[in-house]
Amino acid sequence: MKSIKNYLLSGLLVIAASACSNEELMQPEVTPDATGETVTVKAYLPGNGTPLSRVALEAGGTAEAPTVSVSWKDGDKFSVIRNRQNETFTKADGTNEFAGTLPDAEGSGNYLAVYPAKSKLIGQVASVDLSSQAAGGLNPNLTYMYAISADGKTFEFNHLTALLKPSFTGIPSEETVSSVAISSDEPTDKDQDVMNNNTIRRAYGYNISFTALPTYIYLPPMGVGKKLVFIVATNKDTYSATLTTKKAIEAGKLYTTTIALEKSARTDWEPGLVSVQPVGEGTEKNPYLIANAYNLEWLKTVGGYASNAGKFYKQTADLTISGEWKPIATSTSNPFKGIYDGNDMTISGSMEFSSSYDGACGLFSYNAGTIKNLNMDVDITGRTTNNLGRMGTVAGYNQEGGQIINCTNQGTVTGQYNSGSNISYLGGIVGYNKGTVKGCINEGAVTGVQQGSTSGSHSYAGGIVGYHASGIVSGCTNTASVNGNGAVALSAAGGIAGMIGSATLDGCTKHGTVTGYSGDYCPSNNCAGGIIGRAYDVESVFLVLGCINYGQVTGGESQNTGYTSTGGVIGEAGGSSTAFVACANAGMLTVGTKGKNNYCNAFGRGSFNGVALWVAGDEYALSSGIYTLVKNESTDANSTAAISAMNAAISTYNSTAEEAKKCNYTWEWTSDEWPALKNL
């Protein structure tokens, strides 16, 4: 068979007014030419050129009002598909003829025509996407139609979409609309098998966004009882409305309805929520106001972009999170660089993390900006399938330059079982820190990741940070329990930090319990410390100033060839230049078991340098600088003398230490049972 050319229709829509109403879709008129080699097909748009049907969405019958009609325009195009081949047909200027070459003309099977030609074609599937709707009016290129032809000479088009013309109420006239988001409970992908081996996939996009109130909205066909959720942001507030269909939405029909918007106070976030830009300009004087769950979703979409560095955000309401959470700023190369002021508000609920984000899990993944004055009461769980899995309630990874200031947590942090050879860092506030963490309080239990039976696995858990790699953690308090977990190589749990590298820990206290892991998958080395679980290695240079442990520390179990290290201040230290200044342990210590060597004293196992330290009891690991104290009794001359001697030692230390290493604390008796640090 010779190649056949078709002259067919396709059209760009033009808006017109008419009083007619016709629900028929298309009536083509076919006139083959004399040769039989080509055909001229004349086709009419829905209703023989008359408007789409108009039906009021909330009413019972057909409304009497102008409707939308369509006509063809020069240059219009559509595609024809057959047997995984497709060709484009174009309308000739000044005529009703459309030219193109039929795909696979000598093959068998029906032809599928899809308007407009921009529809994505994948094999026999034509994909329809309504997400590019604009608010300015009707976008004719989204009036999707299809036609089926057995012989390639006659194409009778049918509509794939319906049209909604909404009328919005409830927004004060003095307010300016900045964004509109519409979501539907219809699936984002809904296939329609229009004929054998030819499928239309209506990928409408679950969420559709506009920059102003839309005049028209294209809709997928929907059944009775389906919901359309409208979220509108203005320069002053956020409004919402939910529309439930009282009749089925049919393709090829125009619907009208009134959308009665009300101020939105939704504070509960869940997966699939639409994103709405908040009120504000992102400046220090006029920050973006995170006032509801829609604004929180919006922050996830912009928080990691470099163009938003230095922007200001302020939370103005308590919010709730539930379900799987994609953190804010998930790229290590594009961390959050703004200033987020929690404004002493609380985010509560629960967060679960998929393996896509377990390199850094938290409200924020990667932070290089400032997060302050935020209260977290969120239980978080995650499986660290990534090596170096990092998880904390506020941030998974606080990078260099990042600051987390005056934040609190009351939620639990729990790692899930992982069979891989990985390293995990879990903290009540931050998983992995290279920046500044200051004035934070953790009141939620932290339990390390169960790393399973694979060689090389490490598990670290800390009340404030999982791994304090560098930077400074200061003025922080942990009152909750910290529990180590199983890992073949090493497990470490610390009241403030699970592990410390070349970093500074300043003015921190711990009141909760620290418990080393016992059970299956006992590690070779198991460390538990009231303040720090373990120092990284012999290259670490760390400084610990004015830190006190008041809580019980219980050693765990190790393999028979390994060791357990239990310390009131630190479980194990191997740093080449470590200094503990004005630190103390007042907590009860319980030695670990099963190891070849089990260490248990105020400073666990390792090499230490200490100045003006005290312990409650007889156990200590330093040859000098340690003072054994009893509880505060005015008649105890030995304890009073010890306080004076320790303060003298601090004064001597300050006269020789580098400026950055000077200690700002002195010991004094208070009404408490034990001596306190002044200035802490």
Functional labels for PLM-detected ranges:
Residues 10-11, 148, 655-659:
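Alpha-helical interaction segments
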Residues 14-18:
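Hydrophobic alpha-helical segments of integral membrane proteins
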Residues 265-680:
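Surface-exposed repetitive/solenoidal architectures
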